[in-house]
Amino acid sequence: HNGMDVDIKMAGRVRGIDAILGGHTHDGMPVPTIVSNAGGKTIVTNAGSNGKFLGVLDFDVKDGKVAAFKYRLLPVFANILPADAEMAALIRKIRAPYEAQLGEVLARTDGTLYRRGNFNGTGDQLLLDAMMAVQDAPIAFSPGFRWGTSLLAGQDITREWLMDMTATTYSYATVTEMTGATIKTVLEDVGDNLFNPDPYYQQGGDMVRVGGLQYQCDPTAGAGQRISDMRLNGQLLEADKKYKVAGWAPVAEEAKNAGNKQIWEIVEPWLKDQKVIKPGKANEPRLVNVLPNQGLA
């Protein structure tokens, strides 16, 4: 569970691994990456997340070694394939006490709500907008989680979808006073976690999602030099000035034990009040020095 980049580096350094069926970065890779090392070659694959694909890897083994292989990424058409009866019955039994709560409609979306993006997604923007409105904060941070399902225009936003986007063991909502310098440090730390040229220093996750704040990012720059031109309402942030910042999913123990609400308790009443969500363009930084690498955007 390292992520694609870490798997590729490790495969180039470690002998004796025939294949790595990876996870963590949730990349749906239609073809494998073949990595050479001192002992031969290693196949590196990823099959996405949330049961969207099934990675199928067949080996032709001769004399105790892999002579050939065939890899396919199969889409899972969950609404077409018949469910396993025994498993479906177990799921219904476990869900039964919570079915009504999970199925409650909180709002409807007029556009696609998605999570996966290097810098933001419309689903995460929804969380940011809710935090800023409910907690009266001009800036909001939301973790760069990669998991989650999408909603299409016209679909209901249910409590189950909200939980799907937010349910962790540390989903507490926070409001913090941060200086401009601290905000830059936070963005730089997460940026280095994502863009460090050494995959072993990439700890997983996309860039922290940011609401209310505009900034410039150079993914190719060194540590501490990637983030610049941070602005709130068009005005440059001041290093020593304090700003009110909403967020969720703190890792510090004191934040976990502060008695704060869970993030879904913040977002749910906001959704009910909105009734209809009209997703606009997600707030993303202005990127520099990224062409021709379209993948960074």
List where the protein language model places each region.
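Short, internal active-site loops enriched in acidic
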Residues: 1-5, 146-147
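Catalytic centers of hydrolytic enzymes
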Residues: 36, 47-297
